[in-house]
Amino acid sequence: MFNDLLSELTKNILEHGGKKLIVPNEFCECVSKQGNCKLNSWLWDVPGFRRWRVTRLDAGDRLQVLNSVAYPNEQNDMPIMGIDLLWFEKKQKLVAILDFQPLVQDKEYLDRYFDGLKSLKKSFNEFNSDMKSNIYDPTKYFSPWALFCKGGNFEAENILPKIFSSFLKCYWKNLDLSKANENHIKSQEVSILHIDYDKYSAEKDPAHGLFSGFFGKEWSEKYMKEFLFPLSLENINP
């Protein structure tokens, strides 16, 4: 599960000039001591982006995960792209979130960047679930049009591939639009917001518990802070 989507994402990145960066060996591939879970990580240098990372976790029929986050350059105030897909084979359960994660929540910003995502949410009822969370504040770094699905095999096999492709196309279109339009958030403020995003995510992301269960607490904390959210280690200077 998700291998085809990973291939599609990789193809998209390459078509937009992406080049693989070296990932430290301890993060590039990690196998659990029990041998029942393997994690692979990729880091991309993509024109127009400060950082683009991808994680693929394979725990057999227990769990499959595909996660990717793309941070635009500081000179670009467009949203951060977030993809988080989980498949529980034994339970035949899909949990999927795809979102353009806004740096700010004001109307002018949302009007500039979210027409495409709004349209997708209207077109795919299966990804129109209400996203309630005891972990995240949905008004912080999630958009009101986050594509969220709690489904089964039908959604995983038939709907997810379609919406995944449309989602990526929509995000690339946003990149093109951002080049043609003037930014409303200054580069220094974008940098601060990216740091805040990483700090918030490193604290809230439930993946830490998941990784700890497979790879141990020490490795998981290092992976969270050094690979997933490295800006969480930075200080915010006003």
UniProtKB/Swiss-Prot annotation:
<protein>
    <recommendedName>
        <fullName>15,16-dihydrobiliverdin:ferredoxin oxidoreductase</fullName>
        <ecNumber>1.3.7.2</ecNumber>
    </recommendedName>
</protein>
<dbReference type="InterPro" id="IPR009249">
    <property type="entry name" value="Ferredoxin-dep_bilin_Rdtase"/>
</dbReference>
<comment type="similarity">
    <text>Belongs to the HY2 family.</text>
</comment>
<dbReference type="InterPro" id="IPR023658">
    <property type="entry name" value="DiHydbiliverdin_OxRdtase"/>
</dbReference>
<keyword id="KW-0560">Oxidoreductase</keyword>
<dbReference type="GO" id="GO:0050617">
    <property type="term" value="F:15,16-dihydrobiliverdin:ferredoxin oxidoreductase activity"/>
</dbReference>
<dbReference type="Pfam" id="PF05996">
    <property type="entry name" value="Fe_bilin_red"/>
</dbReference>
<dbReference type="GO" id="GO:0010024">
    <property type="term" value="P:phytochromobilin biosynthetic process"/>
</dbReference>
<dbReference type="GO" id="GO:0050897">
    <property type="term" value="F:cobalt ion binding"/>
</dbReference>
<comment type="function">
    <text>Catalyzes the two-electron reduction of biliverdin IX-alpha at the C15 methine bridge.</text>
</comment>
